[in-house]
């Protein structure tokens, strides 16, 4: 007992000395104590005495004042406090388009050009290496205001999924590589009775097929997305909804519709209710091709291994579509293809945007460079530390208490009881001073995606910041786009009407949005 008591005293003494040495080092490097107000992403209120709040305060010689905001009303709540004259030193901008409104209100500080590289070098290095196109995304009028948070997993495009058993039945041995090969296969699926029931009841494709054909012309259109997507044509940025190549896409798809190759129910989509990612048209054997949902919704049972809480590997559960297929038609075989090459040499398919949010400094920090430097140092330390143990600790809690490594190579952790049932516990204890970074994902599911080249030939928007008037016109323009797609494919509008549609689209606000997009692109995109 005496020995254990001595060990406990020694352990406590060592902990005190360690904290003292950290505090001394902080005072030496950061001589002046600074108070910082910070608005992070959080789903639970942060305790001002949370262990990781205190760790950072000691390490960087700061007092941290965390503003707890309801994430469902995040930007609105921040705006209300700003309207009352309270401007935080550092804050998250939940919706990227709101960068413009904060700029109009003059509540953001300009970040000197070399500050990110100098005072947040690991953030800068990660962005430069993995998402260089976003380094300028937080610029307005040529000045940097926002630090971009970029999704690491939106590097994966939509899947191209084919009925492999149907392909075999109609004599096709490999998935299509070109749009011409795709068209040939779709006709076979519709005309050669691939299910062998003697009925004319199959189709090649339905609504998600629009994304595959548009992608073959370099156009990112996906009716599941409600965001504006832009493409670069020459030196200009134009909305994908009026890209000139779209006229050829619609002419081709009208031909398929007229010939009975495209499911006439494409208007209502492939999902008949329930979980959004399910393609009931594919599951129930109505169509032979789908890009509905994300790649992981189509992974079969055992497609990759998962690590259990005991550290053992076991086959993964099936994705949502794969699970339903196993219940409805367990003999069905499907396979994955590459994005199609079109007649103009382009190849691709829709990919969800990677730009998620921004972080910005309050206007008052513009006059306090020391505070800006200190905030960047904390942000860099928590977001992009080269030590994976440290990074995961400042984002998930104390290793051994809150979580443990299951598979460090694949960056898989196990949250320990009782924290495994406490959503947002890490925010409560102060693991909120970071943003999501585009480090290449290493988890086993993403390893499966790399193996199947889901990271190849995705087309994301050429501009993801949004434009000042985007919110004013977005709903109207999106409705026009969706109505146009249906009208041209079904033949309610002749293809000759396309040029008139473009004029009407531009008149309805599209021209203003396009001008703002080009103004931003020319003013804020720099050569590196």
What are these regions (language model features)?
Residues 2-5, 9-13, 17, 21, ...:
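Extracytoplasmic/secretory soluble proteins
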């Amino acid at each position: 007992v005496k020995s254990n008591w001595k060990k406990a005293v020694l352990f406590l003494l060592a902990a005190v000395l360690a904290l003292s040495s950290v505090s001394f080092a902080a005072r030496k490097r950061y001589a002046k104590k600074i108070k910082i107000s910070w608005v992070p992403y959080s789903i639970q209120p942060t305790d001002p005495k949370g262990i990781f709040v205190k760790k950072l305060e000691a390490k960087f010689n700061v007092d941290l004042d965390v503003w707890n905001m309801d994430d469902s009303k995040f930007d609105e709540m921040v705006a209300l406090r700003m309207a009352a004259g309270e401007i935080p030193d550092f804050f998250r901008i939940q919706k990227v388009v709101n960068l413009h409104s904060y700029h109009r209100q003059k509540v953001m500080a300009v970040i000197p050009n070399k500050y990110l590289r100098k005072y947040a070098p690991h953030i800068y290095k990660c962005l430069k290496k993995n998402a260089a196109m976003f380094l300028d995304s937080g610029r307005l009028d040529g000045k940097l205001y926002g630090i971009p948070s970029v999704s690491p997993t939106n590097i994966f495009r939509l899947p191209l999924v084919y009925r492999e058993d149907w392909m075999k039945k109609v004599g096709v041995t490999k998935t299509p590589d070109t749009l011409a090969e795709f068209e040939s296969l779709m006709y076979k699926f519709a005309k050669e009775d691939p299910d062998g029931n003697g009925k004319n009841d199959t189709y090649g494709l339905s609504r998600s097929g629009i994304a595959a054909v548009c992608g073959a012309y370099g156009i990112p259109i996906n009716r599941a997305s409600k965001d504006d997507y832009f493409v670069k044509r020459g030196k200009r940025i134009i909305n994908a909804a009026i890209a000139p190549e779209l006229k050829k896409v619609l002419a081709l798809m009208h031909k398929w519709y007229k010939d009975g190759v495209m499911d006439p129910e494409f208007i209502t989509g492939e999902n008949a209710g329930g979980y959004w990612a399910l393609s009931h048209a594919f599951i129930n054997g109505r169509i032979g091709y789908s890009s509905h949902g994300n790649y992981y919704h189509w992974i079969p049972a055992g497609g990759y291994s998962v690590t259990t809480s005991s550290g053992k590997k076991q086959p993964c559960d099936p994705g949502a579509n794969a699970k339903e297929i196993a219940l409805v038609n367990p003999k069905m075989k499907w396979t994955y293809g590459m994005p199609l090459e079109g007649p103009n040499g382009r190849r691709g398919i829709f990919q969800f945007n990677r730009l998620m949010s921004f972080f910005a400094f309050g206007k008052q920090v513009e006059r306090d460079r020391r505070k800006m430097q200190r905030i960047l140092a904390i942000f860099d330390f928590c977001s992009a530390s080269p030590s994976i143990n440290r990074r995961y600790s400042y984002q998930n809690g104390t290793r051994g208490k809150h979580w443990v490594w299951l598979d460090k190579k694949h960056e898989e952790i196990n949250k320990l009881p009782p924290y495994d049932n406490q959503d947002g516990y890490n925010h409560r204890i102060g693991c909120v001073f970071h943003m999501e970074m585009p480090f290449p994902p290493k988890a086993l599911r993403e390893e499966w995606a790399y193996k199947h080249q889901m990271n190849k030939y995705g087309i994301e928007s050429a501009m993801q910041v949004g434009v000042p008037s985007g919110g004013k016109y977005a709903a109207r323009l999106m409705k026009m786009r969706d109505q146009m797609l249906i009208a041209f494919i079904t033949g309610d509008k002749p293809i000759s009407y396309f040029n008139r549609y473009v004029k009407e689209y531009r008149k309805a606000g599209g021209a203003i949005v396009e001008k703002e997009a080009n103004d931003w692109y020319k003013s804020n995109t720099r050569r590196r």
